[in-house]
């Protein structure tokens, strides 16, 4: 019982509980298309990958899992990305429980070293940013799938929401077999996904600075300045390196128009930030490009 009163011990317990619950749900017969349910290893691996927003898969998400199974996976990487400790903070606030310094520090560690401060304010920011970014990206993707690709509304909405939540949480899961390779020429699909990944990769401390100080660079904390500067530098280096190495590769950027080449080079400079989507065949990348990906990751 002592672990439940200690946030430092509670965090791994909650993650483990989410993984086990997710694995159990994925083993149910109606979680897979064939109606047989996933094996224990497949279910546990997929659940762990989703909660830890790793994005690694051992079966094709699009064809192996049923609508229920995909819904479970979406819920798992939303929980993982949001941070179970953040949810625990919410439950404590709803119950009227006060939070001391230890709880606030534990919450700060879980959500990318948030500044020790008012838990209510932090929680409100997390909810607001999450719902806003995921909602806006989901709407853009849904409309694009409907208007440009003639998806039925329900199908467009599903794919829009799935990719929006996956992108914001840097999960890398896709409801398409080829990730987003089928949309490598569509900036309306790729750019919102890129921006969502970048926003969440910056972290909530940076968002807090923006909320309190706007775009006043001098008023920002050193952490925010370093984070933003490093992010821009890494994106530029990745973009230039990928474009330079893959520009003439016939299996990746080679056959594309200049604008599409630049778009996909930019997309793949963002994705190593634990996002995991791909608009190009990563297996066809040149060795130097893969090395750059390793460095960026």
Q: Which stretches of residues belong to each language-model region?
A:
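Membrane-proximal intracellular helices of multi-pass ion channels
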Residues: 1-297
């Amino acid at each position: 019982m002592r672990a439940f009163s200690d946030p430092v011990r509670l965090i791994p317990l909650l993650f483990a509980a989410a993984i086990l619950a997710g694995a159990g749900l994925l083993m149910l017969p109606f979680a897979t298309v064939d109606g047989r349910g996933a094996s224990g290893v497949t279910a546990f691996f997929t659940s762990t990958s989703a909660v830890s927003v790793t994005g690694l898969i051992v079966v094709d998400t699009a064809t192996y899992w049923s609508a229920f199974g995909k819904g479970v996976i979406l819920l798992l990487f939303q929980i993982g990305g949001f941070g179970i400790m953040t949810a625990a903070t919410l439950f404590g606030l709803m119950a009227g429980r006060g939070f001391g310094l230890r709880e606030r520090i534990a919450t700060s560690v879980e959500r990318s070293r948030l500044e020790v401060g008012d838990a209510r304010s932090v929680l409100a920011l997390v909810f607001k940013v999450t719902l806003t970014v995921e909602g806006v990206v989901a709407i853009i993707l849904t409309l694009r799938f409907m208007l440009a690709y003639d998806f039925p509304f329900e199908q467009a909405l599903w794919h829009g929401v799935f990719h929006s939540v996956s992108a914001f949480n840097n999960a890398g899961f896709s409801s398409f077999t080829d990730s987003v390779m089928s949309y490598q020429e569509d900036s309306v699909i790729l750019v919102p996904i890129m921006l969502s990944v970048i926003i969440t990769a910056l972290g909530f401390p940076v968002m807090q600075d923006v909320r309190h100080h706007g775009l006043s660079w001098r008023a920002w904390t050193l952490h925010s300045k370093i984070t933003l500067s490093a992010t821009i530098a890494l994106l530029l280096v990745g973009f230039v390196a990928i474009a330079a190495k893959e520009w003439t590769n016939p299996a990746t950027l080679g056959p594309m128009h200049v604008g599409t080449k630049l778009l996909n080079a930019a997309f793949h400079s963002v994705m190593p930030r634990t996002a995991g989507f791909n608009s190009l065949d990563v297996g066809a990348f040149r060795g130097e490009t893969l090395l750059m990906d390793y460095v960026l990751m």
